Amino acid sequence: MKNNTILFTFLIVFLIASQIEAINWDILIDTIKDKLGKRSEDREFFDFFTDDNLAALEKALKEY
């Protein structure tokens, strides 16, 4: 029963997110890059955002 609830919740969230067309992915990418340059205490969290990974993420989001 719990798995069905999780799947149903994921489905609803996915359907809502797929309808959002006004997301400006460039602003999202710039925000992530800005976080990389500032706040050294958050650096560990953003360590996986290397330039290659950011480029791949940006490409994937634009293709979406």
Swiss-Prot record:
It is found in: Secreted. The modification Leucine amide is found at residue 36. One of its GO terms (biological process) is regulation of defense response to virus. Antimicrobial peptide. Coiled coil: none annotated. Expressed by the venom gland. This is Peptide Ctri9677. One of its GO terms (cellular component) is extracellular region. It comes from Chaerilus tricostatus (Scorpion). Belongs to the non-disulfide-bridged peptide (NDBP) superfamily. Short antimicrobial peptide (group 4) family. Residues 1-22 form the signal peptide. Keywords: Amidation, Antimicrobial, Antiviral protein, Cleavage on pair of basic residues, Secreted, Signal. Residues 40-64 form a propeptide. Shows a low ability to inhibit hepatitis C virus (HCV) infection in Huh7.5.1 cells.
